[in-house]
Amino acid sequence: MTSTVPAETSLNKFEKLKSEKDGLAVKSELEDFARLGWEAMDETDRDHRLRWMGVFFRPVSQGKFMLRMRIPNGILTSGQIRVLAEVVERYGEDGNADITTRPNLQLRGIRLEDIPDIFRRFEQAGLTSIQSGMDNVRNITGSPVAGIDADELIDTRGLVRKVQDMITNNGEGNPSFSNLPRKFNIAIAGCRDNSVHAEINDIAFVPAYKDGKLGFNVLVGGFFSAKRCEAAVPLNAWVDPRDVVALCEAILIVYRITGCGANRQKSRLMWLIDEWGMDKFRAEVEQQLGHPLQTAAPKDEILWDKRDHIGIHAQKKPGLNYVGLLVPVGRLYAPMFDLARIAEVYGDGEMRLTVERKRDHSRTCPMSSVASLLKEPLLEKFSVSPGLLVRSLVSCTGAQFCNFALIETKNRAMALIRELESELELARPVRIHWTGCPNSCGQPQVADIGLMGTKVRKDGKATEGVDLYMGGKVGKHAELGTCVQKGIPCDDLKPILRNLLIEHFGARPK
């Protein structure tokens, strides 16, 4: 293969800093950074290279860092939850944790001087944040009910873990994949409802039968960015589950060697596929693999609409249930300790996070125990039967903590949804997604109603506003929504949403 890495004279700021020093090099310097303090350390290390360790400097809360974890398949043990809760608790009101759409956790309020101690605690608990930021493969997504779903086709837990271990060198850091042209997302679906949002990942594996054998059809190139949003397209390949890791590795190597990072607005995998065409891209992947790929199965098994997972659901094992709780807009505070206790008292000590819904799942015992669980005070906040708008509400972090966000999102989203639920009767859930900027972390393009933050003018003054998206669909026949109205002031949004819910989604005034 011919390298298209740009000449050094054309390197942009990010490619230049990567060429000067691998981001993983800061792993050995964390103790020094902790002693120096954030104000005295090298700005490039602080603002950029620390992200290879999952540590993010935030200009909007200087001195308080964000820490992004790696939680493969979104599964945590009660012991791990306690370790994370202890980290958040030490910072009082400044500390909190957000569930992300990968599904992962981001811890906020972190002090740089505490990082070495925090990382030692993580290592003891089997946790890591390695390579969770910048131009790396992000958290690997799998089915939130893998291994316990009565209707699942493939248990994705082991595959997700193997892919992560390959990418991160078993959590130690892997220089082979620490210098991709841009960030990279991988998802492995094991159920019929596309719970992983396969279409918005750079590589997605969806279950499919070929010649009577269950494996995966492969999609490539899905992504969101400020410049362009594209759904993943078929690679025309079917793989045995045993070959998933090797195919991921081959695609990543092709992307690393031939993808162009010179223009960061045109450096995601789909841009390379567009430049080459799918036939050439597939051929390059086959060359890296060392053998031809099988052609795709005629159809995949994504046959259902997106399941909610909130509430009480029977597990694969007779007599056992799992309970899905709503964490409103994905924000966790002190209740993390309660979640750990509940997971142990009523289940096997395991908690799971979901992709779109941002929920917590607790595997439970027979129905007699479920009845006791439902009486827990925590379930007044994290409900098993929330309203039909709040249960599907998704929001990015917003301007409270993110310097890219153009508007405040989480608090505004919750306040507006409460008002709408108090005024309207709904027949079904409506998925409303908020994102603070065009980077689309809140994924408005997959929502029934998507709201993207922007700046608008009202009465001659600049104010916070949104662009309105509609038509997104998840599950079978997934589609990306489109922008239908631009520049709505947030103060004017409520009547617009109210009318949309009535006219398009069957809501009725109370």
From Swiss-Prot:
PANTHER family (alphabetical): FERREDOXIN--NITRITE REDUCTASE, CHLOROPLASTIC
InterPro entries: NIR_SIR_4Fe-4S, NiRdtase/SiRdtase_haem-b_fer, Nit/Sulf_reduc_fer-like_dom_sf, NO2/SO3_Rdtase_4Fe4S_dom, NO2/SO3_Rdtase_4Fe4S_sf, NO2/SO3_Rdtase_FeS/sirohaem_BS
Record has Cytoplasm as a keyword: no
UniProt catalytic activity: 6 oxidized [2Fe-2S]-[ferredoxin] + NH4(+) + 2 H2O = nitrite + 6 reduced [2Fe-2S]-[ferredoxin] + 8 H(+)
Gene Ontology molecular function, alphabetical: 4 iron, 4 sulfur cluster binding; ferredoxin-nitrite reductase activity; heme binding; metal ion binding
GO biological process, one term: nitrate assimilation
Source organism phylogeny: Bacteria, Bacillati, Cyanobacteriota, Cyanophyceae, Leptolyngbyales
The organism's place on the tree of life at top rank: Bacteria
Similarity comment text for this entry: Belongs to the nitrite and sulfite reductase 4Fe-4S domain family.
Keyword terms: 4Fe-4S, Electron transport, Heme, Iron, Iron-sulfur, Metal-binding, Nitrate assimilation, Oxidoreductase, Transport
Protein name: Ferredoxin--nitrite reductase
Top EC class of this enzyme: oxidoreductase
Catalytic activity, EC: 1.7.7.1
Residues noted as binding [4Fe-4S] cluster in the record, renumbered to the chain: 396, 402, 437, 441
Record organism: Leptolyngbya laminosa
Chain's gene name: nirA
Binding positions for siroheme per the UniProt entry: 441
